[in-house]
Amino acid sequence: MFLALNYSPQAVRLVQSGQIKIDFFKTPDWDWLIRQATAIHPVAVHFTLEAGNGSISQIDWKQVDRLSQLTGTPYINVHLDPRQHHYPEISVDTQSDADVKRVYRVMLTDVMQLVDHFGAEKIIVENSPYRGEPGNTLRLCVEPEIITRLIEETGCGFLLDISHAIISSRYIDMDTYEYFSRLPTHTIREMHFAGIHRLNGQWIDHLSILKADWRWLDWVFMRIHMGEWSQPWLLAFEYGGIGTAFEWRCAPGVIVKQVPMLYQRVCDLNSRLSAV
């Protein structure tokens, strides 16, 4: 398993100065940024594709394939993220069988378009965070049974965003251990992780790692070590980034302190797994 870190100017300076060690920068699928990042360090591209809103058919298939091959990223990810503003006539927290059936059909169709182009073995489906926000992510797409069903029916792999799973479990009022136990963790191909803070009455991720977050990561690593969950190719620390949405959460002090702690955990897990 490798370690990636969100690309940011602060992260670049720390990598170039030798203050932190990572295996990959994680970047969005922006051509200019990938060119900039690959000149400095290996890159794992994270695609901005979404399933559930009927937009997959509009993507540039050649561009997706080109960026995947250019960076050597082994998987093409898609976010399972139908949003209420695409379905204004249903409530964001709907659990109606008719609504679930309707939206699931769109999610399945979107993912299968990717499967038809690239093959199921190449596609990984990421779980989104649900917070019950009007216009935003629908609750039904974070239900573990829905995620599991989609993975099984499409044959795709699972991109487990640990922080998203924790946040979603809190907002749907399900015990977090129970939530994880219902996810298709035997199909994990990649994982994402970041700190979760309570800000303005909401649980927000992509922040510095707190004590409670470390405990969750260690618990996840134990599941992998015990062979209960499959081993991902990559763990991405989703701290920092490009633009105004991230400029307030790119503290060099956080990166220089927490990345080595993550890297050591990844190395320790790799050593334990290779000794089995």
Regions found by a protein language model. Name each.
Residues P9, D29-D31, L49-A51, L80-Q84, ...:
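Active-site-proximal loop/turn and secondary-structure-junction residues that shape catalytic pockets
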Residues Q58-G157, I167, V254:
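Active-site acidic/histidine proton-transfer and metal-coordination neighborhood
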Residues G54-S55, D93-Y104, S168-P232, G240-G241, ...:
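Gly/Pro-rich active-site loop or hairpin
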Residues P134-T137, I162-S163, S169-I172, W203:
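A short secondary-structure junction signal
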Residues F246-V276:
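C-terminal helical cap(s) of enzyme catalytic domains, especially alpha/beta-barrels
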Residues Q16-K21, Q36-A39, Q69-L70, D116-F118, ...:
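Flexible, charged surface loops at secondary-structure boundaries
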Residues M1-Y7, I20-T27, H41-F47, P74-V78, ...:
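Hydrophobic faces of well-ordered beta-strands that scaffold small-molecule active sites
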Residues M1-S68:
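N-terminal pre-domain/capping segments
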